[in-house]
């Protein structure tokens, strides 16, 4: 009779898991499917939980006596619980000194345990608020970082534009053009020309200005090449 197969409580090693999802297995449809969502109950840390359970369950559903009222101030109740724990701890020390074997020691220990359970429960009721506040702070940090990044980009852009304008302003007017290009000549337009000639002349003037700008850019590139 063979020995029963032992099942590990831990997941399989990562490399063995990765080997199941190779390109060939995915192409052939042999890769394992993802596990189905849990619909009823599950085990976690040795305890069974229902999927529809509340994140923070009331004390009554856990079989624990409620010491505070239904409507209360969390801060006041937490302070009261803290003082009660301190007083009960001092009582416990007094019992341990006077009569360590007394039954009151177990009773006082249960009282302290109940107080700690209530304190943890009230603290856990702040968890949703803590999660929302953490998300808000995280989003504010991301917003501030993005605004600072955009501001730095804007400053760099202004600096680059200023440098380019200074470079263009420092170019002499009689700078020789590369490849023997002719200088651009512009003449005033005759006011007696018809509208069609005026439109044609505007197009020619715009083309001339564009060529002049290109020539200046080319000349600046030549200067930079000579400097380097």
Swiss-Prot record:
Keywords: Activator, Nucleus, Transcription, Transcription regulation. InterPro entries: Immune_Mod/Transcr_Coactivator, Med7/Med21-like, Mediatior_Med7, Mediatior_Med7_sf. Pfam families: Med7. Component of the Mediator complex. The gene is med7-b. It is found in: Nucleus. This is Mediator of RNA polymerase II transcription subunit 7-B. It comes from Xenopus laevis. The keyword Transcription applies. GO terms for molecular function: transcription coregulator activity.
